[in-house]
From Swiss-Prot:
Its EC number is 6.5.1.9. This is Cyclic 2,3-diphosphoglycerate synthetase. Keywords: ATP-binding, Cytoplasm, Ligase, Nucleotide-binding. It is an enzyme of class 6 (ligase). One of its GO terms (cellular component) is cytoplasm. GO terms for molecular function: ATP binding; cyclic 2,3-diphosphoglycerate synthetase activity; ligase activity. It comes from Rubrobacter xylanophilus (strain DSM 9941 / JCM 11954 / NBRC 16129 / PRD-1). Belongs to the cyclic 2,3-diphosphoglycerate synthetase family.
Length: 442
């Protein structure tokens, strides 16, 4: 096992040499290099560690340079405080995992997620830094864009409420509306799962899959995505888009990745911890909700700065979401039901009225809270239709209520609005068609 040792000058060199010998014996490690992370207290001039030594201005840079020079399978950390702390170690872990190497310490081991290659056609993945960052909305937007441009996409959707066996929905042929979703609900399906949302709103072929659990680096504990990927490979489509779930990453190799993060998130959560790993393996960052009040003043600039510290070359596109009904609402009195925070509901309602000619007489942002949603619906005035996202309780509460009351239920998507987004996504799709050459970025 080709191994990079991480060492520092706070340890007496003979102690480090003895530790390296023991690691080689116990782990079957073959030392190919050492990265010197800093510290001078116990190191003399010209100390010899018996391996090529890589040093830099800071610990993270030393590890990055060593990983670039030497192809290793494991990074063994023999350093400690005060040379490296928790933040530095998470950055080092991200670098190691992105290079395909295990990161091993005295009481921990992180391994890179296992990504399986499914041959057959070009592929993209849309992954996220957490739940409710708009990842599935970006996936749907990407699918529609690719469809318009003649790429003939299929989406493999991974969700916590997906089916026990991968299920194919031909969004273009099926009328995936309220009646269809209610029937799916009666069969015991999670009818607001992401794959129903994508099929209904984007009208592309969608393969629904499930996953449970998510590791620090995004690997699901259990999933049937690999089976879904094989099904997608056999479909009459031209490109496959894999939709992640929360911060979990589809366990398949892809040609290009889009990372979706929310500007409302803590910058440390996006660019620190193993958010840095997600930045390192991605080719484009879409920074959603990049407006006040979701993002406080200066937050977008701070996030971009933090991202640049990890990936200076990664394109970053700030974006906002705006609702788009998939049915005609002009002249209607509607109740708008969403997962959006209360602070932006008035703005979104105004967008619907101005852009689509409806009158929004009631709003609720409690789509993910069934009890509060029920209270909101009870207190609403009479409407012509419920306008709802396909999320959370959209089917079992809102759609069912509409059916019981004899009111129309019209589904609503959220489009990312951002300068340069279409061009960046299409460049990634074309690059995926050429195959991954080893160079990242667009």
């Amino acid at each position: 096992m080709r191994t990079l040792f991480l060492i520092d000058g706070e340890h007496y060199p003979p102690v480090v040499l003895d530790a390296m010998r023991r690691v080689r014996e116990q782990l079957g490690a073959k030392g190919v290099a050492a990265a010197f992370l800093g510290g001078t207290e116990k190191i003399g001039e010209g100390a010899d560690y018996g391996l090529p030594l890589v040093a830099a201005e800071d610990p993270v840079s030393a590890v990055r340079q060593a990983l670039e020079r030497y192809g290793v399978e494991a990074v063994v950390d023999l350093s400690d405080e005060p040379v490296v702390g928790y933040r530095e170690r998470m950055r080092i872990a991200s670098l190691a995992l992105a290079a395909g190497a295990r990161y091993v310490g005295s009481d921990f081991e992180l391994r890179p997620p296992e990504m399986r290659r499914v041959p057959g056609k070009p592929s993209l993945a849309v992954i996220g830094t957490g739940k409710r960052v708009g990842k599935t909305a970006v996936t749907g937007y990407l699918a529609r864009l690719l469809d318009r441009e003649g790429f003939r996409p299929a989406v493999v959707s991974m969700g916590r409420g997906g089916p026990p066996e991968p299920e194919v929905l031909e969004g273009r042929r099926l009328e995936v509306g309220s009646d269809y979703l209610l029937r799916a609900l009666e069969r015991g399906a999670h009818a607001a799962s992401d794959y129903y949302e994508t099929a209904a709103l984007s009208r592309v072929t969608t393969v629904g899959c499930r996953r449970c659990g998510g590791g620090l680096a995004g690997e699901p504990f259990v999933s049937n995505v690999l089976e879904g990927a094989r099904i997608a490979a056999g479909l009459d489509t031209g490109i496959t888009v894999f939709d992640g779930s929360g911060a979990a990453i589809p366990p398949v190799e892809v040609d290009r990745r889009v990372l979706v993060a929310g500007a409302h998130q803590d910058p440390e959560y996006v660019a620190g911890y193993l958010g840095a790993y997600r930045l390192l393996i991605s080719d484009l960052l879409v920074l959603t909700m990049a407006e006040e009040p979701m993002a406080p003043p200066g937050r977008v600039e701070e996030l971009v700065r933090r991202v640049r510290e990890v990936r200076p070359d990664l394109p970053v596109i700030p974006a906002v979401f705006r609702p788009r009904p998939v049915g005609e609402v002009r002249g209607m009195r509607v109740a708008y039901v969403s997962t959006a925070p209360p602070a932006v509901l008035k703005r979104l309602a105004g967008h619907l009225e101005e852009g689509y000619g409806c009158e929004v007489v009631a709003v609720s942002g409690n789509l993910s809270n069934r009890s509060k949603l029920a209270e909101d619906l009870e207190g609403m005035p009479g409407v012509d239709a419920y306008l709802t996202e396909i999320k959370a309780a959209a089917v079992d509460v809102v759609t069912r209520r509409g059916a019981e009351e004899g009111r129309r239920v019209i589904y609503c998507d959220n489009d990312p609005v951002a300068e340069g987004l279409d061009g960046a996504l299409l460049r990634l799709a074309r690059a995926a068609g050429r195959g991954r050459s080893g160079d990242r970025g667009v």
